[in-house]
Amino acid sequence: MQEQYRPDLIEADVQKYWAEKKTFKAVKDPSKEKYYCLSMFPYPSGRLHMGHVRNYTIGDVISRYQRMNGKNVLQPMGWDAFGLPAEGAAIKNKTAPAKWTYENIEYMKNQLKVLGFGFDWDREITTCKPEYYKWEQWFFTELYKKGLVYKKTSTVNWCPNDETVLANEQVHEGCCWRCDTPVEQKEIPQWFIKITDYAEQLLSDLDQLPEWPDMVKTMQRNWIGRSEGVEITFNVAHSDQTLTVYTTRPDTFYGVSYLAVAAAHPLAESAAKNNPELAAFIHEAKNTKVAEAELATMEKKGMATGLYAVHPMTGKQLPIWVANFVLMHYGTGAVMAVPAHDQRDYEFAQKYQLPLFPVIKPADNSAWDFSKQAYTEHGITINSAEFDGLDFEATFNGIADKLEKIGVGKRQVNYRLRDWGVSRQRYWGAPIPMLTLENGDVVVAPLQDLPIVLPEDVVMDGVKSPIKADPEWAKTTYNGQAALKETDTFDTFMESSWYYARYTSPQYQQAMLDADEANYWLPVDQYIGGIEHATMHLLYFRFFHKLLRDAGFVTSDEPSKKLLCQGMVLADAFYYTSPTNERIWVSPTKVTLERDEKGRIIKAVDDEGHELVHSGMTKMSKSKNNGIDPQEMVEKYGADTVRLFMMFASPAEMTLEWQESGVEGANRFLRRLWNLVFEYNQNPAQTALDPTALSVEQKALRRDVHKTIAKVSDDIGRRQTFNTAIAAIMELMNKLTKASLSNEQDRAVMAEALNAVVRMLYPITPHICFQLWQDLGNESTIDFAPWVIADAEAMVEDEKLVVIQVNGKVRAKVTVPADMSEDEIKQVALAEENVQKFLNGLTVVKTIYVQGKLFSFVAK
């Protein structure tokens, strides 16, 4: 055994061994319990960042731990390879997106290998390869045949100068990123998948996910947004038109004072025909892109249409307004406004002097000042004809019944969830497999024509997608007739919605999935990824699993049993202000720091002498130049050190603050472990451990070893508090470094302890443990060694320390045999001088005994 710990020598050798032996190759084995551990696959942006390293280290620790516990483990890896950044990089670097992507994959794959992750590389998936997206295209055609896919017009960002559609990321302050032309909102036909058909299942099946974080489930519940209400139809005065609204508050129906419609509502557009001012307002509102999240805070604007709706119960004429806070794609594109009981309606009414009719009062009869704000709680109904005096539920049902009876309303369950628009007017994505015939009919591309391959050898001009710019690409035939291929491509969330399932049979060519393999491995046992994916990817992932189930590929309802959302990685960020008043962010690796006695930064200077402002710990990002290159850290300290720091510095689901001092600490710990094994190896145990021949000290040390094993097993296996598991091992190591090695049983206890420590650390720091396991004289490799089991007998204590109290105050501490009875302990306590002193002259009225811990006298 080498005296010095040299990760640079060990790690490459161990990784080479794993690659040659295919140590982590997963093969279906019905006789073994499977464990499928999956971390969200990366977008091949060029380099791994610390967020990736954290995600994949957590997954690797869980995978290796489960393998040691006898499970048949699948841990695959691949590349979410389509997406907009490749187009931008291709234009900037004058290359094709495919070439840029494949080069990045090669580089990043090597980075993953250097970190020692135990992936089954034989199952690698690259989503931009035709053999992958062929089956996605086929599945889309099957969904179309089932009626789950349709085409409708939808709004996109449109650059009139380049005549192209822009992604949200390409719109900068309302203008095109390339030419600065003001961006318009344009309606174009797009493909949608009916996720709303599955809304109820997606909602109710959240109850089947007890091991998903509550926060993610709450976010999905809110995103799906189930509500119960009434759809009400108003007649438009002096016309045969009607206006339909949906409300969850029919109890406020008598308080409606106006109706508001979206700018794109047909009623608004017909009213604008002879009203140029209204037409201009509608044009402006349509071209202001508003995210739903911004609706609450933006300025409410509106204009009267001159039309009126008739209240079906009171006959009142209610003005119809166009309002910028009503969205056409949400509900019916029209709302009934009750300013007295809805704050948004209230603000709009105040601005445009519209009336307010209170119809609810607080249940406790307290007065409400409507001049200040709306009363939005449930309460007692007033000013509502025969419904006066009723509570919310009775009024809701009474008014809903009456609306249904007079034929203008129907009870309805609505969802906030919208259908999934999967069309993208981009090049670097999977082509949508639909054909348009010369007569205008739209048909699915037949299986024998799939995959519709995206050409990879293209030149990007930054304006038009190469497949849209080349009219020849779209030309094809269908049953002998001329046809045109769809030139839109899929939203890249399509690829990431089913990759987890394809990993179970990545080379299978007869179908999308091999059902036998899929049903052996699925559902995923442990999924790991960021909480930022809660309402997009994680919802589509669940939706796709239900589609695969209904297509007969899988039998389970949900794609993954357990979800862990790891926290972000933060680092110090520093900047100075340039002469042009621009913030120049400086990498922390180029900063010299001065700290006060509490470790706080008081001065920061970069290599060029600029005095820097420390803006605190923020998420590692390119924009703040505070990312730390994992590669550099591995070269400096070794992969095991980086992995150990990542798992120790913070609980997995909390943010992790990158501190190089912490990395150095992790490295020192591994050196101590190496040195301890080296020292032991100078004179190793020659005889086996004999538990009956141990001294008190040896028993105590062995007890600590087995208690640590029990804690670490629980922390990693059940609680997933990896940092506390490592802390327990470090605490044990402190005891081991002080332990005697003077006799044979000392060395036998140490041999057992070191073998246990190496096995416990193996999932976290596998390279050093691989080597130390051999150095400790084990014949087999540690990769297939079983997890260490705590010996219950070793943990039994011979003696207990019992605290003695008199009237709640500690007066003595006594060490007694562990099996001593309560009565015997009482006698020992009474024999203590200090106890006698405080009981002197008092009568004991009660004693309290807490098994093996506390004996208390209550005396008067």
UniProtKB/Swiss-Prot annotation:
Q: Which residues form the signal peptide?
A: none
Q: Enumerate the PROSITE patterns for this protein.
A: AA_TRNA_LIGASE_I
Q: One GO molecular-function annotation for this sequence?
A: ATP binding
| InterPro entries xrefs | aa-tRNA-synth_I_CS, aa-tRNA-synth_Ia, Leu-tRNA-ligase, Leu_tRNA-synth_edit, M/V/L/I-tRNA-synth_anticd-bd, Methionyl/Leucyl_tRNA_Synth, Rossmann-like_a/b/a_fold, tRNAsynth_Ia_anticodon-bd
Q: Which CDD domains does this one have?
A: Anticodon_Ia_Leu_BEm, LeuRS_core
Residue interval(s) of motif 'HIGH' region? 42-52
Disulfide bond residue pairs: none
Catalytic activity of the protein: tRNA(Leu) + L-leucine + ATP = L-leucyl-tRNA(Leu) + AMP + diphosphate
One of the GO biological process terms: leucyl-tRNA aminoacylation
Q: What is its main location?
A: cytoplasm
Arranged from A to Z, the UniProt key words for this protein are: Aminoacyl-tRNA synthetase, ATP-binding, Cytoplasm, Ligase, Nucleotide-binding, Protein biosynthesis
Q: Record's Gene Ontology CC terms?
A: cytosol
Can you say where in the cell this protein is located? Answer: Cytoplasm
NCBIfam families membership: leuS_bact
This chain belongs to the protein called Leucine--tRNA ligase
The lineage is: Bacteria, Pseudomonadati, Pseudomonadota, Gammaproteobacteria, Pasteurellales
